[in-house]
Amino acid sequence: MTSSFNPKKESILDLQKFLGKEICVKFTGGREVQGILKGYDQLVNITLDQTQEFIRDAEDPLITTDEKRFLGLVVCRGSSVMMVCPTEGCEPIDNPY
């Protein structure tokens, strides 16, 4: 007996409005990249172009240095994506703790 019920798989994030725009992606493990969103799927696998990685301080991994590394075209695995945010319209604030 087969079931005719096939639920549609929808993305947990609606990134459609950010296609072609610059976004910031943070990963489990602390890495952080910034690039232009070229595509995504329902599992939040993300494709970024003109991607740069922010290098962390060797002595304190919670601190991001001014140093960047150019990566180019990157495919980010959805299971390691912790946060996605637009770079336009956002401004960083100091840690309140």
Curated annotation (Swiss-Prot):
Q: Which UniProt keywords apply?
A: mRNA processing, mRNA splicing, Nucleus, Ribonucleoprotein, RNA-binding, Spliceosome
Q: Which GO terms describe its cellular component?
A: catalytic step 2 spliceosome; Lsm1-7-Pat1 complex; nucleolus; sno(s)RNA-containing ribonucleoprotein complex; spliceosomal tri-snRNP complex; U12-type spliceosomal complex; U2-type prespliceosome; U4/U6 x U5 tri-snRNP complex
Q: Which Pfam families match?
A: LSM
Task: State the protein's purpose.
Answer: Plays a role in pre-mRNA splicing as component of the U4/U6-U5 tri-snRNP complex that is involved in spliceosome assembly, and as component of the precatalytic spliceosome (spliceosome B complex). The heptameric LSM2-8 complex binds specifically to the 3'-terminal U-tract of U6 snRNA.
Where in the numbering of this chain does the Sm domain appear? Answer: 10-90
What is this protein's name? Probable U6 snRNA-associated Sm-like protein LSm7
Which BP terms in the Gene Ontology apply to this protein? Answer: mRNA catabolic process; mRNA splicing, via spliceosome; nuclear-transcribed mRNA catabolic process
Q: Which SUPFAM superfamilies match?
A: Sm-like ribonucleoproteins (SSF50182)
